[in-house]
């Protein structure tokens, strides 16, 4: 794993299919993420490969929206998407384990994203990449804990 990718896991006391239904409902992401405030399906879509959704983010210093495309929708196993046509890949993998499901959230900057950040932020691109990387590394454990609480009814 490089500095531009990160994943973390938690065991959730629910079966993979039920947990998949929860994490593939992007409209709930604003409940769990410390940075994403809301998501919605574009054009009335849903969690299927090729479907787009928009996310509204706020890091306390700035607000922005992203457009994402679902790239994996395998019920009970994996749900993943890419942001801005491949700049960053986010996803959840689910694996049955004793006591429920191991839920892993992953994040990875893609080569297109590095290039895109340099085009968008110019001389501030590297600083922005560090900021986004830190946000992912700090936010993923928080998001996983919140999903676990929701899924387990807490």
Residue ranges with predicted function:
Residues 16-17, 46-47, 71-76, 93-102, ...:
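A short, structured loop/turn motif at beta-sheet edges
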Residues 1-11, 134-141, 153-154:
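Hydrophobic-ligand-binding modules of eukaryotic lipid transfer/binding families
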Residues 41, 142-154:
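Short, highly charged C-terminal tails/helix-capping segments
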Residues 18-23, 29, 53, 70, ...:
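Hydrophobic pocket/interface hotspot
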Residues 1-43:
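Hydrophobic ligand-binding cavity/cleft-lining segments
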Residues 5-7, 63-67, 87-91:
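Short, surface-exposed coil-to-beta transition loops
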Residues 82-138, 142, 147:
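Beta-strand/loop substructures that line and gate deep hydrophobic ligand-binding cavities in soluble
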Residues 51-58, 78-85:
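Short beta-strand segments that buttress and anchor functional surface loops
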């Amino acid at each position: 794993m490089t500095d531009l990718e990160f994943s973390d896991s938690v065991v959730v006391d629910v079966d993979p299919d039920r947990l998949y239904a929860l994490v593939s409902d992007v409209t709930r992401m604003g409940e769990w993420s410390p940075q994403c405030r809301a998501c919605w399906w574009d054009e009335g879509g849903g969690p299927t490969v090729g479907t787009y959704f928009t996310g509204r983010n706020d890091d306390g210093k700035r607000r922005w929206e992203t457009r994402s495309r679902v790239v994996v929708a395998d019920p009970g196993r994996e749900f993943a998407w890419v942001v801005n046509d491949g700049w960053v890949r986010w996803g959840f993998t689910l694996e049955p384990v004793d006591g429920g499901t191991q839920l892993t959230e992953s994040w990875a900057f893609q080569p297109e994203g590095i290039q895109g950040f340099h085009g968008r932020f110019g001389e501030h691109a590297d600083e922005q990449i560090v900021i986004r990387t830190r946000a992912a590394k700090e936010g993923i454990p928080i998001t996983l804990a919140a999903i676990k609480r929701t899924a387990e009814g807490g």
